[in-house]
Design a protein with these regions (language model features):
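Bacterial N-terminal signal peptides that target proteins for export
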Residues: 1-10
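Bacterial N-terminal signal peptides
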Residues: 9-19
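An extracytoplasmic/periplasmic, membrane-proximal ligand-sensing/linker region
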Residues: 32-41, 46-57, 232-299
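Bilobed "Venus flytrap"/periplasmic-binding protein-like clamshell domains
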Residues: 35, 40-63, 75, 98, ...
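Short helices/loops that flank or line small-molecule/ion binding pockets
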Residues: 79-93, 106-107, 124, 141, ...
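A ligand-binding cleft/hinge motif common to bilobed small-molecule-binding domains
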Residues: 94-107, 165-168, 191-220, 224
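Short beta-strand->loop
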Residues: 110-121, 176-179, 212-225
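Small-molecule pocket liners
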Residues: 123-128, 226-232
Length: 299
C-alpha cells in the first residue's frame, strides 16, 4: 500500500468514526429533547456549587428512571424558591417545613414525599454547635449572654426549631443573647462559629455532623423535625407525581445496588423516602404559633 493510499485510508476511518459519533450524539440529543423538561429546585442549605454537586446526581437518576428530563434550577435563597414555584419556573422542589407553609399561604403546593434519616425514620433535627475549644459553652443554658448564628429566617432547622428549643427548653429568649444574626447557608453558620465570629450556631444535623471533626462540638439537639418535603405545584400532571414517587420509593438503602446510587446524593435524602401529607407539618405550625405569641415573627 502506497503512503498516499495509507493516509487516505486513515482519513476515511477517522471521517467514518466522527460521522458515527455525530449520529450517535444526534440520537442521544433527540432522546433527551423528546422528554418533557421538569425543573427541580431545593432550599439553599449550602453554597450553590456544593448544592449542584449534591443535587445533580438526583436529577440524573430521575431523568433515567422516569419519562421526564429533570433539570436543576438553584435559587439564591429560601424566599426565591417560593417565587420559582409560584411563577412556574420550577414544578418540583425540596422545601423545609417553614418554606412549605409559606408557599402554601400564597398558592397551592402538594407535599408528595419526605426523606428518611439514617435510622430509617422520616425526621431530622436541629443541632446547636460551638467551638470544641470553648470551655464556657457545654449545654443549652450556657448560651445566655452569648452570640449565636442562625441560618435563614425561612429555615426550619436553622432558625425556627432552634428558637423554639431555646425558648421552651432553656427559657432563653432572643433578648437574652448578646447578639444574633441570620446567614444564608447552614455551612456559613458553621464557619462563622469556627472563625470565632459567634460563640454558637444552629444548623441542620447533617451539617453539624460534617463539621464535628473540624473544630465544632455538639451542645444540644432538638426534638425530631418532620422530613424536608418534596413538593409539586398543584397543577402538575398526576403522571408526573406518580413517576417521581415510583422512582424514589422503589429505592432501598440496604440494597447494595441502590446504595451505590444513593450515596452520590446529599445526606438529606440518601437514605430513602416516605410518602408525605400536609398534616405531617402541623408541628411546624405549632412552633410558629408559639413563637408568634412570644413576639418572634417567623419568617
Amino acid at each position: 500500500m502506497s503512503f498516499k493510499r495509507l493516509i487516505f485510508s486513515l482519513l476515511l476511518i477517522i471521517a467514518l468514526f466522527f460521522s458515527a459519533f455525530s449520529a450517535e450524539s444526534a440520537v442521544s440529543s433527540k432522546d433527551k429533547t423528546a422528554k418533557e423538561v421538569i425543573y427541580f429546585s431545593a432550599i439553599t442549605l449550602y453554597h450553590p456549587i456544593v448544592m449542584y454537586q449534591r443535587y445533580q446526581p438526583l436529577m440524573d437518576y430521575l431523568t433515567k428512571n422516569t419519562p421526564y428530563r429533570f433539570e436543576l434550577r438553584l435559587s439564591q435563597d429560601y424566599g426565591n424558591i417560593i417565587n420559582f414555584l409560584k411563577s412556574n419556573k420550577v414544578q418540583v422542589a425540596l422545601l423545609g417545613g417553614v418554606t412549605y407553609l409559606e408557599a402554601k399561604k400564597k398558592f397551592d403546593v402538594i407535599p408528595i414525599l419526605k426523606p428518611l434519616g439514617p435510622d430509617g425514620k422520616p425526621f431530622y433535627r436541629c443541632v446547636i454547635v460551638a467551638r470544641d475549644t470553648d470551655k464556657e459553652i457545654n449545654e443549652l443554658s450556657d448560651l445566655k449572654g452569648k452570640s449565636v448564628a442562625f441560618a435563614s429566617k425561612l429555615s426550619t432547622s436553622g432558625n425556627l426549631a432552634p428558637l423554639y428549643h431555646l425558648y421552651t427548653e432553656a427559657g432563653i429568649e432572643l433578648k437574652d443573647l448578646a447578639r444574633y444574626k441570620n446567614f444564608r447557608y447552614h455551612d456559613s453558620v458553621a464557619r462563622e462559629v469556627l472563625r470565632g465570629n459567634f460563640d454558637a450556631g444552629a444548623v441542620i444535623d447533617s451539617v453539624a455532623n460534617r463539621f464535628k471533626n473540624r473544630g465544632l462540638k455538639i451542645i444540644d439537639v432538638s426534638e425530631p423535625i418532620p422530613g424536608l418535603p418534596i413538593v409539586v405545584r398543584a397543577d402538575v400532571s398526576p403522571k408526573l407525581i406518580e413517576a417521581i414517587k415510583r422512582a424514589l420509593l422503589s429505592l432501598d438503602y440496604n440494597n447494595p445496588e441502590h446504595r451505590k446510587i444513593m450515596e452520590q446524593w446529599d445526606e438529606e435524602f440518601r437514605y430513602g423516602f416516605a410518602e408525605a401529607k400536609d398534616s405531617d407539618y402541623d408541628s411546624i405550625r405549632k412552633m410558629i404559633d408559639y413563637l408568634g405569641k412570644k413576639g418572634v415573627k417567623i419568617p
